[in-house]
Amino acid sequence: MSLVIMVRTRLTTGGIAEPVVADTAKSLAKLGHRVILLAWDRTGKFETTSTTEWGTIWRYQEECALNSPVLFARKLPGFLWWSTWQILAFHKLEKNIILHYHDLDTLPGGVFTSKIIEVPLVYDCHENYPGLVKGAVSNTVATALHKFEAMLLGSCTGIISAGPANYARINNMLESGTKAPFAASEEEAHEVMKMVHQDFLNSKLTRVGNVKRLDSYPEHKIENREKRDKFRILYIGVLEKHPSRGIIETALTVSKMKDVQFDIGGFGTLVPNLKKIDAKFENVNYMGPIHPDNVPLETINCDVVLMALDPTNINNKLSAPNKLFEAMSAGVPIITCKELLMGQLVEREEIGLTFPWGRWDRLRAIIMNMMFDKQMCSEMGKRSRRLAEKTHNWERCEERIESLYRFVKRKPNPEVA
C-alpha cells in the first residue's frame, strides 16, 4: 500500500483534523495505507507532531486569523512551500506516495509538488471555493479563481467532491475547462442527487459528502436521549458574519420566547457579540468551541438542529453542510431555509421545517409549531435517521474512496486519466 500525504490549511478545535478529513484518513488507514496530514495550525499553539488512530499530524505553526483573507493570502505561500519540502523529504525515503490535497487553497501546491516527484494527486474539493469567497473578494477575483481551478483539474489523477452541486460543477469543468459555468444549476444538482451509488465508482471523479459514521450516533443513545423542560435548539459550527448563518438573528428571536433554549457552539468573529447576548438573555447559551468527539452527543440531546444560510451566496444556496447530516445521524429534525437546495431536501423527505431567509417571524412560528407538536418532531427525527441508515452514511463513502484510490493507482498519469 501507499504512503498518503494529505495537506490542509486548517485544523479544528483541539488542533485536530476536521471530521470529514479524519474520516477519510481513517478509511484510507483501514485499507492499509499509511497516512500523514500536513496541516496549518493557525493558532500556533499545538504540538508540532501528534499521533492519531489513523496516522500522524504534522503542524505548520504560524498564527493567522481565520477571518483575515488578506493575511491568509500573504501567508499561504509559506505553508505551501513548507508542505512541499516535507513531501520532498518523505520522497527520499518512500517512492510509493499518493498526494491528497484538500480544497483550492492548497491545490496549486499539490499540482507543483506532484509534477516534481511524479506521483499521483488526489484533489479533495469540499466546497465551491470561488463561490464561498465571492462577496469577500471582487467578482473578477472570484471568476479568476474559478478559471484557475478549472485549469488545475487536468493535473489531478483523482477528484473527490462533496455535495451534489459541487460534483456537477466539477464535472462541468472537466468537460468544458475554463468555459464551464461558475456554479452548477439547481437542475444539475438534482440530477446528481438521482445518481445511484455505482455511478460514483471506478472513475476520476467521485462524491464523498459530509455524511457521518453512524457508530458515532448509536441507536441506544438516541432512544435514551435526555429529557428536558425546555425546547433545545442547537447550532455548532462556524461563527462568522459572512456568509451569514443567521445566528445573531436567531438568538435575538429566541431571547423573546419562553421555554426555548438556543445553545451555540463554535468559534469565529461573532463570539464577542454572542457572549454579550448570552450575558443578557437566560435562554441563549454560548458553549464555546466544541470538540468534534462531543458533537454527536450534543446533537442527540437536542430537539432540533438549526442550519440557516443566506441564499444570496451561491455556495450556501447549493451546499449540503455538516449540520444536515449530523441531524440525520442523530435522529433529530432540522430547521433550515426554503430557498436552499438543502431546504428542498428537508421538505421533500419531511425531516424538518423551513422558513424564508430573513423572515425571523416565520422562524419563531416554526419553533412554536415544533414545541407544541412533539409527535411531529419525533416522526421527523425517525425519518431522518432512516434516511441516514439507507443512503447518507459513511459506509458508502468509504467504498467510493477505496474505488477512487484503485483508479488512481491504475492511472498515475493525469493526462491519461
Regions picked out by a protein language model, each given a short descriptive name:
Residues M6-D23, G44-F46, E240-R245:
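A short, glycine/small-residue-rich beta-strand->loop->alpha-helix junction that serves as a flexible
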Residues K230, K258-V260, P272-L297, N301-V304:
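Nucleotide-activated donor-binding/catalytic signature segment of Leloir-type glycosyltransferases, i.e.
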